[in-house]
Amino acid sequence: MAETPTVKLKGKDRIVVWPAYFDADRSRSEGRKVPKRLAVRNPRLTELRHIAEKLGLNPKVQRDKRYPKRWWDDKGRLIVDKVESKRKTLLMIAEKLKERRES
């Protein structure tokens, strides 16, 4: 797995993707960014990385990062290329994640 300790986000050509964005057990105020119908329970960083690779988003894994709203939870994050708006990118990932979980 390609892990990078530091990734520069300057230039806004990269997007931070936290597993919490796709977690069906979280409310919007707790950090979920996708609609409930596209969210899954306990999304894993490895799943998100795999999906981002398939979508050609050039994901970089940062396992040592913690989602600010849940600083005690060390699930890590992904840094992906920005090909669309952040919302559209998250929806693309969420749709593929939902398909993967349902198959």
From Swiss-Prot:
GO MF annotations, alphabetized: 7S RNA binding
InterPro entries xrefs: Signal_recog_particle_SRP19, SRP19-like_sf, SRP19_arc-type
Record-linked Gene3D superfamilies: Signal recognition particle, SRP19-like subunit
GO CC aspect terms: signal recognition particle
Localization annotation: Cytoplasm
Keywords: Cytoplasm, Ribonucleoprotein, RNA-binding, Signal recognition particle
Keyword Cell division: no
Biological processes, Gene Ontology terms: SRP-dependent cotranslational protein targeting to membrane, signal sequence recognition
Keyword Cytoplasm attached: yes
Described purpose of this protein according to its UniProt entry: Involved in targeting and insertion of nascent membrane proteins into the cytoplasmic membrane. Binds directly to 7S RNA and mediates binding of the 54 kDa subunit of the SRP.
Family of this protein: Belongs to the SRP19 family.
Descriptive protein name: Signal recognition particle 19 kDa protein
Lineage: Archaea, Methanobacteriati, Methanobacteriota, Methanomada group, Methanopyri
Gene responsible for this protein: srp19
